[in-house]
Amino acid sequence: GLETALSWNVVNIELVGTRASPAVIITQREKAVVLFRGGSTTRRAVENQLEKRGVKTVELLVDLRMQPEEPCRIEAQKRINAAALAENTTRRASCGEVDLELFRTRQGCILRMRVGGQRFITLSGTVRPAKPIRAEWLLASMARPDNIQYTDCLTLSSKYRWMEEDAEPV
């Protein structure tokens, strides 16, 4: 019917796991892209959510952790590990509706992503871009969004330390 055709191309973007280090899951149909950070609690939350969404294939897993204690055990066709990238290098990838760019800094990384005409950004570690970066959506974490201009924020917490100070969305 018409209803299934309409929901067939829906892209879901969700934060799951712990408030301290949430993962981002982008699902469309039976495929997903996972932006991973955190430990075993977040990994289990990702696996549960992928199962709930009926995902059969993780096309890309981007591990945003700067100092992973253990490898991320989520199966994926393709992986990018931020910690393994050289400082000041960029990796780009595309999967279905998702175009992403991962920029590695000395102490962290910036992940910019375009999905369905909307720009998303998430940070890991300590990142201070020299010039402002604009996005419609900040996918929030504990990482302070210095010099990031965003309209809306997807977050698991309203109590990140950076929110209390001067973090008014633009």
Residue ranges and their predicted role:
Residues 1-170:
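Non-globular, low-confidence helical/coil segments that flank catalytic cores
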